[in-house]
Amino acid sequence: MDKRNSHKGAFWATVLSNQQIRTCYYRLNLELEPAATPVFGSMSPGQFAMLDLTQVALPSQDKIPSHLQDTVKRQLILRRPFSFSDMSIENNDLGSIVRLEIMYCVLGPSTVRMTSLSKGDKVNLLGPLGNGFELPEQKDLAILLAGGMGAPPLLHLASVLKTQRPQCRVVVFAGSKNCDHLPFTVRIGNKTGVVLEEFEQLNVECFVTTDDGSAGFKGFVTTRAEEWLKKNIWQPLKTIVYACGPEVMLSATAKLALKYDIDCQVSMERMMACGVGLCQSCAVEHKTRQPEQTEFRLCCQ
């Protein structure tokens, strides 16, 4: 386990806002209790928390998507993992307070319940968990590949890179099945094409791809990223690739980085029961340095 931030704990968070940004995507903003500041204040992009949603009520019947009407009847027992799209530390009368932003997609009984959270509600979370992204100081170009709901931790990473590594150029490639599945505030610009406002606010270069061509480049983020690499001047030793998204995309990203001899970090995501390695349910098979050999490692570690 990464020892850069091995501290974690269970804390209460107060809902500040819960905004729908796309058909099935929401942005949840939380303020943690003061005791969480020493722990979450040093959190790295890419880490996550396990939310306890067992006591959160379902929304009214008319607000539950029709295809989830039966699914939401399942009883919740376990916490659910969520990464963060932003983290900030604010000062108020109580001292330093951590605020977190979670972007989530409504997919099942847990996330359906999350849509009913409103300002002032409280939820319990366990974290921060997992390993965050590393930020090498010698890099002057960071290429971020975000696939679907793999986008939140990369939005957080882009923000941190802009503030902590101002000398590093950040270029983002964000992809999804179609325009409706881009988990961002989307705007069509007259000159700039498809604009993702969250990255625009960070003053970060961003290229959009969709499988069906309904927004931006038609194709995969890895294809668009390779086109960019071929057309621009960059140095392999001073470049790093970060990625989060579907595993097939992460595999393609790793192959792309290997082809161009670029350092690469990928964030793996799995459904899990505990988030701390006890349940062993998030094992991921990966290659070793020995040809034809693989081993399993836990996604949460």
Segment roles from a protein language model:
Residues 2-119:
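Ferredoxin-reductase
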Residues 23-25, 42-45, 95, 135-138, ...:
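Short glycine/proline-enriched turns and hinge-like loops at secondary-structure junctions
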Residues 39-46, 69-80, 96-99, 186-201, ...:
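Glycine-rich, flexible loop segments associated with nucleotide phosphate handling
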Residues 109-271:
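FNR/FR-type flavoprotein reductase catalytic core
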Residues 153, 247-248, 269-301:
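Local cysteine-cluster metal-coordination motifs and their immediate loop/turn environment
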